[in-house]
């Protein structure tokens, strides 16, 4: 199915099938269960969503625990700060408006080409989440530099075909290129005003990206905490504006019915994602 979907020629598909059968790795539902030297039992109820950070890729932390982890590193920086040992809020003018930047704020949010962009489900999921957020009146914070760098032109084709690109654009996740960008430090400079206030007040600011490396200084020299997440969570955290929160119960805003907007209210269902994949992708795109 994957080879058909991605536009491979039938002769190539037949060759792959014949080769896999010849070396014994082509399986059907009618085959006998293979015998394994070892087996592993896993309780699926123990699987929980997670992000990684703030300093290394192996620092996995569940969404519920992420707030405590982020605050721990944030407070360590604040306690060593010479100017003040309290959480700092800095006001400055940006794009003609008074803006506030505080310790813990996100200043870079990027859906990157690393790892995730070969998987349509998470990118379409990010687009659907953006659509739901816009429909509820949510916007990303003005102090965040947002970007979208797919790993393939095909991504742009199916996002446009589904009409989801416009919602990512509205949240600032414009397509900036194809290939390595923010994940290897190629985010470019932060706006001068934001760069200056971070330096002047020694603020603890962070980044969130869908890459696979988050070592100190790799994403940007001024982001002291860097978190790795799925494209959907990158959009969600950008809407929240900070990493020192429990994103699962964070209140993003108030809707038209004066009800609190939570992550579950903008998170697309698996059916919505699968329906979009089935209607939005075709072999001709490849």
Label each region the model flagged.
Residues 36, 40-46, 207, 211-214:
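Self-splicing inteins and homing endonuclease
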Residues 115, 168, 235:
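Hydrophobic, well-ordered secondary-structure elements that form the walls
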